Swiss-Prot record:
Source organism superkingdom: Eukaryota
Keywords: Lyase, Magnesium, Metal-binding
Motif placement: DDXXD motif: 315-319
Name listed for the protein in its UniProt record: Terpene synthase 2
Function: Sesquiterpene synthase involved in the biosynthesis of volatile compounds that contribute to the characteristic flavors of black pepper. Mediates the conversion of (2E,6E)-farnesyl diphosphate (FPP) into alpha-cadinene, delta-cadinene and delta-cadinol.
Cofactor binding note of this UniProt entry: Binds 3 Mg(2+) or Mn(2+) ions per subunit.
Amino acid sequence: MDAVSCAINALSAQAPPKHLGGNNVGRKSVTFPKDIWGDYFLKISPNEEKLDSWRVRAKELKEKVFDILSCAKGAEQVHIIDALYHLGVSYQFEKEIEEALKNMLTTYNDDTSTEDDLYTLALRFRLLRQNGFHASTKALNKFKDAHGSFREDLASDVMGLLSLYEASYAGTVDDLILDEALAFTKIHLKAALPHLDSHLAQRVSHSLELPLHKRIQRLEAREFISLCEKDDSIVIKELLEFAKLDYNILQALHQWELKELTKWWKKLNLVGKMTFARDRMTEIYFYVSGFFFEPQYSRGRIISSKILAICSVVDDEYDVYGTLDELQVFTDAICRLDVAAMENLPEYVKPLYEAIFFSLKEFEEELAREGNAYRVNYLREEVKNLCKSYLQETKWLHQRYIPTLEEYLLVSEISSTYTVIFNGCFVGCGEIATKEVFEWFQAFPKLLSDSARIGRIADDIMSCKFEQSRGHCPSAVECCMEEHQCTKEVALGNLDGVLGRAWKDMNKACMRPTPFPMEVLRPIVNLARMAEISYQYEDGYTFSGGKTKERISMLYKDPIPV
């Protein structure tokens, strides 16, 4: 039995908690906003002639960008690599960037000169850290005064401040100087903001709202390309043209995937049969593609989106519709996952059980042709763990029990669906999805736990008001308030500290040497980034008509004019 299952079973087996109340929680009445995309992606037809011409031109430009990157040295090379990340095309030059960063690390850690300005040095540091290289913070000391504080004359170097601000989020718990850097840069960037030109003010405001380290690359690319179109001094012309074409070519692939998923979802008609549930196929794909956008992960995105769409209905079955007795029977059936187990289920929930059972069988049959059917067993176990975690949360609601924060997170990190998402994605991946990777996922390593923790707490902070109004198990906010007997404001401050620590621990876990390559680790961090994005303004999944709709339009609906 895996570590997650053992922990949930242990909690479930505990004697009833002290804070028992009435046990009469019945069905809840909740009306979720309707699906806003409908058949939109079914109707999209790519212009193959235009796509072919884009591919030909992109191939030519890629060679030119390769030459530019290969010839660049020193600070110029640093700026080009940074531009590749901002423009969303770094994945096209991974080997070249890796080699450049290895060389950069040697000169960075050995260099005691004062050649680099604040902007370039902080940028070197961030690029190295975000790729898992242990760049020292000692070089930043040259920007401090005799009293050990950052020099006040740096306040006039806005680009340098912005670069240091972004770099400060790549720190670990041991990097105290980066905490100082964050506080220093925040104060001076906010003070400078009213006096900046519109383009620079936009960049600074954007970063103060959500730092680059917490943004997803694909959205950043769209926004950065738009910024570069307004200011042609930011990047080289050929690089910008290549980024636009690459964006549109990849968008066409994502549109095709959404079309296939929409067809499948409409045919399944699960929400039509279980009308209490949220209908969010497009939003689920947005979430999944946020941490795995590259073309080689197409099948992984499709499989993960399918199982997550079904699990979203499972979530609503536990949260808003099923009675405790029904949910216990459903959980028992899921733990068996065979056709015979369906006989004892209420009629209304059988379509949901069938969707889980037959989708997993479908994945298994597809992967059997490659000799990888064993992967689906790991996904199957995580679906079982997910339902166990949902049931435990439902029991807490019925018992009127408020667990400690750590007790709550032990369960809710699983109910966040992160383990299902990752297993679903890697089930459909290529050679990087080894048995060792699945075993590592099943052990629920700290990196995955921290990512799930960020997702759960970000969700709870934004969602607790709506969820508590309809009857929901306690959120992280309520758990923290009860445990520490504090106000909501104090609890939110405590949780902000938990989030900050989780980010720093993830940064440390990605420092080389690592148990697996960055291709395995980076998506875990990206999922935490998706949580920051999704709950930045509201619960962008449940209420998807605002910023989420705007972002989906940017990513999958509207190509960049070229």
